[in-house]
Design a protein with these regions (language model features):
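Short, surface-exposed loop/strand segments
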Residues: 1-100
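Acidic metal-coordinating catalytic centers involved in nucleic-acid phosphodiester chemistry
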Residues: 69, 73, 78-146
Length: 146
């Protein structure tokens, strides 16, 4: 399995292709929909389901130190969650068919530092406060679906 995944770690685009394929298979019965980033970006969401799952993926551009990897992942999560909870972006989400978000998945090939879990919890609380309880969980997936 590791060898299979390894071929998709060469770029963020390859990682995104793999993640989208996995989400399409896993959530096809829940109406999974990919969001292309070509026109005005994807707003911090790679795809979503009709059941309220949205996800964003991240693949490091190079071999970072543990601290650098944490910083890049933290910054990516912060940036994407900020878009996700922006009042300006709310009409875009609704226009895409995203009504009630129940879960936000951050899919990464690896993480080496518990601080990213602590940061995810901080962001979860931030989203809950903003959305007044409509997002139930923020989940970090490592190596796609553990």
């Amino acid at each position: 399995m590791i060898e299979f995944i390894q071929q998709y770690l060469s770029s963020g685009e390859e990682w995104e292709k793999l993640c989208n394929s996995c989400y399409r298979i896993r959530y096809q019965e829940q109406g999974y929909q990919e969001i292309p980033a070509k026109y005005k970006g994807d707003g911090g969401i790679e795809g979503f389901t009709k059941s309220g799952i949205v996800y964003q993926c991240y693949c490091p551009e190079k071999a970072y130190t543990d601290d650098e990897l944490y910083e890049h992942m933290r910054d990516k999560m912060t940036k994407d969650v900020s878009k996700f909870i922006s009042k300006d972006y709310e009409p875009v989400l609704k226009g895409l068919g995203i009504r009630d978000v129940r879960e936000w998945h951050f899919v990464v090939p690896e993480y080496k530092d518990k601080r990213i879990l602590e940061h995810a919890e901080k962001k979860r609380k931030e989203v809950l406060e903003y959305k007044k309880g409509t997002v139930n969980s923020v989940i970090i997936y490592r190596k796609i679906l553990q």
